[in-house]
């Protein structure tokens, strides 16, 4: 199993690479790519960690060597948020980066599963889909927007509030990966109940958690370490499913039946070919139903922005 990380010299990429080097199954290959010249050195640094995961690093404009034979490609390349920016302010720079890298994936490893981490995910996934479609290699079961950070944050905040072990809590999060489009389904957390005020406050905190980190880092960056952990969790789940493990479920932002929007984050059963089944979002509370209806315009606009970027 070969996993490629594109954007591997950045804050998210390095954290992700470290976690994959220590947690990928024995015999896996990990390839790191970034435009930055330090990237081969990041791979050498990680190669000293005693795990049976082969690692190589590549830098420069061309990601081909890193992508050859990749089964999973995780893309975290791009610029990070600064205070006062929201994820959509990143669009102007990151859209071009994602387009370029996905073109290279389409050419070199068209059958790979692709996880897009680069923000704004609501839009960059649409860009990736259109690029793959133009290349004639788009498979909607193999393209994912990685929203796992919203899930791990939800799990953490709910566990803190309710005095639970974080590992015991699993909150499904649907919609998108920015602001109001992030919708934690708190009504579906087993064995935990919330007041209306708690639901409103928690939902808002989960939606704004990225900003919480950006502000706390005082201009020095955005959520890189927790995002690295979230991306590793998703990537490792995907690897387990591709290797035949049954019953692997993760939420991610994928193209579905278009019931809510062309792309939508929902629980997915993963399998040997990527998405095996898009699971139902279940019964929503009145608060959640209202929030879902209220976000769709924003989500659809985000998606259209990505489609237009490629097709203009």
Swiss-Prot record:
Residues that bind NAD(+): 7-13, 34, 94, 117-119, 227
PROSITE patterns per UniProt: MDH (PS00068)
UniProt enzyme class: oxidoreductase
A single GO BP: malate metabolic process
GO molecular function, one term: L-malate dehydrogenase (NAD+) activity
Any single Pfam family the record assigns to this protein: Ldh_1_N
Binding site for substrate: 81, 87, 119, 153
Superkingdom, taxonomy of origin: Bacteria
One cellular component term from this protein's GO annotations in UniProt: cytoplasm
Recorded catalytic activity of this chain's protein: (S)-malate + NAD(+) = oxaloacetate + NADH + H(+)
Alphabetized UniProt keyword annotations: NAD, Oxidoreductase, Tricarboxylic acid cycle
Active-site positions on this chain: 177 (proton acceptor)
EC number, as in UniProt: 1.1.1.37
InterPro entries hit by this protein: L-lactate/malate_DH, Lactate/malate_DH_C, Lactate/malate_DH_N, Lactate_DH/Glyco_Ohase_4_C, Malate_DH_AS, Malate_DH_type1, Malate_DH_type1_bac, NAD(P)-bd_dom_sf
Complexes and interactors: Homodimer.
Entry's family note: Belongs to the LDH/MDH superfamily. MDH type 1 family.
Function statement: Catalyzes the reversible oxidation of malate to oxaloacetate.
HAMAP family to which the protein is assigned, alphabetical: Malate_dehydrog_1
Record protein name field: Malate dehydrogenase
Organism: Escherichia coli (strain ATCC 8739 / DSM 1576 / NBRC 3972 / NCIMB 8545 / WDCM 00012 / Crooks)
Taxonomic classification: Bacteria, Pseudomonadati, Pseudomonadota, Gammaproteobacteria, Enterobacterales
């Amino acid at each position: 199993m070969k996993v490629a990380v594109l954007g591997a010299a950045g804050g998210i990429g390095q954290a992700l690479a470290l976690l994959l080097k220590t947690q990928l199954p024995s015999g896996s290959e990990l390839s790191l790519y970034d435009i930055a010249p330090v990237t081969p050195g990041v791979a050498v640094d990680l190669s000293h960690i005693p795990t049976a995961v082969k690692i190589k690093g590549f830098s420069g404009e061309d990601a081909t060597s890193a992508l050859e034979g990749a089964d999973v490609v995780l893309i975290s390349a791009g610029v990070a948020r600064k205070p006062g920016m929201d994820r959509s302010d990143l669009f102007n720079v990151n859209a071009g980066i994602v387009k370029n890298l996905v073109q290279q994936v389409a050419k070199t490893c068209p059958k790979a599963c692709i996880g897009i981490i680069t923000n704004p995910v609501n839009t960059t996934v649409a860009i990736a889909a259109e690029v793959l479609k133009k290349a004639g290699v788009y498979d909607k079961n193999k393209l994912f927007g990685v929203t796992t950070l919203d899930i791990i944050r939800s799990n953490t905040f709910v566990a803190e509030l309710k005095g639970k072990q974080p590992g015991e809590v699993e909150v499904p999060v649907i919609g998108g990966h920015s602001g109001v489009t992030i919708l934690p389904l708190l009504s579906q957390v087993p064995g935990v109940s919330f007041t209306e005020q708690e639901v409103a406050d928690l939902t808002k905190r989960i939606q704004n958690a990225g900003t919480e980190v950006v502000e706390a880092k005082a201009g020095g960056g955005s959520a890189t370490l927790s995002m690295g952990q979230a991306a590793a969790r998703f990537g490792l789940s995907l690897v387990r499913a591709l290797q035949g493990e049954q019953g692997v479920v993760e939420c991610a932002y994928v193209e579905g039946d278009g019931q809510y929007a062309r792309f939508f984050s929902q629980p997915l059963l993963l399998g040997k070919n990527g998405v095996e089944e898009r699971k139902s979002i279940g019964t929503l509370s009145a608060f959640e139903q209202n929030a879902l209806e209220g976000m769709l315009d924003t989500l659809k606009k985000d998606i259209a922005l990505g489609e237009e970027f490629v097709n203009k």
